[in-house]
Amino acid sequence: MIILMMCLLMPQAKSEGALPTETRSDAETSVRANSINATNEHTDDMHLTEAQYFDALSVLELEEMVQLRKRSGQYDDALRHLTILIKRVDDLDYHYEEALLYELKEDYAQAAQRYEAILTAPELSPVFRRNIQFRYGIVLSDMGLDRDALAVFRTVSRAKDLKSHEKLILEYARGVAYIYAGKTRKGIRKINKTLLKQNSDTGSWIEARARAALVYVLIEESERLTFEKPKKTAQRFQKRSELVGAAEEQIVVMINLGEPEYVLRSLVLLSEAYFQVAEEMRVAPPPPTLNREQQIRFQKKQLERADFIDERGRSYCAKGVGYSDQMGFKGQARLELEVCANEE
């Protein structure tokens, strides 16, 4: 039987697996060069009913259709094929693939339920169980349940046979969860230490996930520097520019890593940061030491600067949409960027 754990586990049988070194977005980015038209000779017979179509497919063909539709971003259709496959062969690998497809759809609640169900299976090998626990922790973090995710990661980290790169993957995951759980300094320390230790076996997806968390921290810190005090406006604008610039540098690294999921998430945050700065500049009060004429000039200049910054943020939205199309990646972040890019 073909093992359907291509996206996240390393390409060995599940008894020999390891913590995931590939991203769930690999399923989407494999379609970068050409969009796959997921059809075969069975779909040419348009007179076939749906039941007849599925009956005509062998187990091997169903597996192939699941993978084709997944690679082309047709997750609902992939799930339809997978449901038929599970009815024919109730295999844990297929249930894993089902959970993964829900992750790709960003339906994290459904993915979490399925990972939980798999973990109740008595026949899981220790390594396969560890993989599922890890994915479950990632999904919990994506649902905003970072304290629960940290508990899961701690359980995984107790395994005696973890390889060095698996420990690094876990440290990245824990650092990210710490940040989103509000333990920012601890999370940053973990991520920075892991960046110094990582190797080629660690996997680009988890590094990109960690860098996206750093972008979140940088943007959050920049937004705390408001322009309410006129005397500090110039100083705070400079500091915010530096923080946003540091966030941009992290995004460039993620682009080079080839991880669109986290690039797009970060571009949403970055564009929102620009819009926030622009909005605050429009309402920032002029220094009280200026006379009326100087205040008018100050406000006019602030409005011009705000318009420029606003346009800069919108340009990042448009670039994100273009990058998403180039990479063949779909998701909520892409939709948000598209809405932003098309706003007047």
Language-model region placement:
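Short coil/linker segments at helix-helix boundaries
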Residues: E220-Q250, Q276-R312, Y316
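Generic helix N-cap/helix-start motif at coil->alpha-helix transitions
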Residues: F54-L62, R88-E97, S125-R135, K163-E171, ...
